[in-house]
Amino acid sequence: MNETILVKIITPLSIALERQAKMVTIPGEDGMFGVLSNHATMIVSLKAGLVQVYIDDIYNPQITYLVSSGVTEVTGSYVNIATETAINVTNLSEAEIATKLQGLQKPLSEQH
């Protein structure tokens, strides 16, 4: 399977990621879901969690981003993930990722 899909992670300030991938897994409001090329078109609410991008194969993610809530647009050729926050956590430990995720999940009233 050589087909790829364009994955974009977009925040209000920048495009955090834009690259071709074999697969991407995304934290939707109804649970995690995976997207390969030629996926059915859909719009999905995004919840805070990990977006894993599989570049070389569909078994080991090479890039991982921690994202806040937002929206995901999926088509057969691309995935646009629009989120308030996107943090590249590829090289962080599980404990560091868990701490950052807790910060994203706090209600806004607790963050100020």
From Swiss-Prot:
Q: Which domain of life is it from?
A: Bacteria
Topology within the bilayer: Peripheral membrane protein
Molecular functions per Gene Ontology:
ATP binding; proton-transporting ATP synthase activity, rotational mechanism
GO CC list: plasma membrane; proton-transporting ATP synthase complex
Carries keyword Cell inner membrane? yes
A Pfam short name? ATP-synt_DE_N
* Disulfide pairings: none
Matching InterPro entries, A to Z? ATP_synth_F1_dsu/esu (IPR001469), ATP_synth_F1_dsu/esu_N (IPR020546), ATPsynth_dsu/esu_N (IPR036771)
- Location, primary (coarse class): membrane
Q: Which family does it belong to?
A: Belongs to the ATPase epsilon chain family.
Q: How does it assemble?
A: F-type ATPases have 2 components, CF(1) - the catalytic core - and CF(0) - the membrane proton channel. CF(1) has five subunits: alpha(3), beta(3), gamma(1), delta(1), epsilon(1). CF(0) has three main subunits: a, b and c.
Q: What does this protein do?
A: Produces ATP from ADP in the presence of a proton gradient across the membrane.
Record's protein name: ATP synthase epsilon chain
* Native organism: Rickettsia akari (strain Hartford)
Q: Top-down, what is the taxonomic lineage of the species of origin? A: Bacteria, Pseudomonadati, Pseudomonadota, Alphaproteobacteria, Rickettsiales
